[in-house]
């Protein structure tokens, strides 16, 4: 692969309903086989459910949930002298957002509600309150980093 220059990041256009870039990115994370309209229907359906259940602004619930799920540190494998160490490293802001969105999607998929919109609404509400599958995943990653703090001097 050529190493001439860094590939520029593409700008994501804000979503049509709320004009929010993070919501548009989340739709792209949810999208399967390029079916954006299906992803939009799921996200907007989940937002309607949030408004019904919680009576709060869905955008606020979404942003609080995303911020709660964002990891601060994670572990990376590093080989030193024939042994692999799990080295805790700080997570870049762009990766934080990407991981949070991915974890929310996966946690929502594993839930038992009927439709994906309902599952997503439930997961976003729980994450905004500091519980749920995505929060469990974040806490697990933080625990791993805490447990391997002794190897933090092997920084990359």
UniProtKB/Swiss-Prot annotation:
Tell me the subunit arrangement. Part of the 30S ribosomal subunit. Contacts proteins S9 and S11.
Q: Which source organism does the UniProt entry give?
A: Cupriavidus necator (strain ATCC 17699 / DSM 428 / KCTC 22496 / NCIMB 10442 / H16 / Stanier 337)
Which keywords belong to this entry?
Answer: Ribonucleoprotein, Ribosomal protein, RNA-binding, rRNA-binding, tRNA-binding
Family to which the UniProt record says this protein belongs: Belongs to the universal ribosomal protein uS7 family.
Q: For this chain's UniProt record, which GO biological process terms are given?
A: translation
Which domain of life, per UniProt? Bacteria
> What is its biological role?
One of the primary rRNA binding proteins, it binds directly to 16S rRNA where it nucleates assembly of the head domain of the 30S subunit. Is located at the subunit interface close to the decoding center, probably blocks exit of the E-site tRNA.
Q: Which GO terms describe its molecular function?
A: rRNA binding; structural constituent of ribosome; tRNA binding
Q: What is this protein called?
A: Small ribosomal subunit protein uS7
Q: Which InterPro entries match?
A: Ribosomal_uS7 (IPR000235), Ribosomal_uS7_bac/org-type (IPR005717), Ribosomal_uS7_CS (IPR020606), Ribosomal_uS7_dom (IPR023798), Ribosomal_uS7_dom_sf (IPR036823)
Q: Name one GO cellular component term.
A: small ribosomal subunit
The yes or no answer to whether the keyword rRNA-binding is present is yes
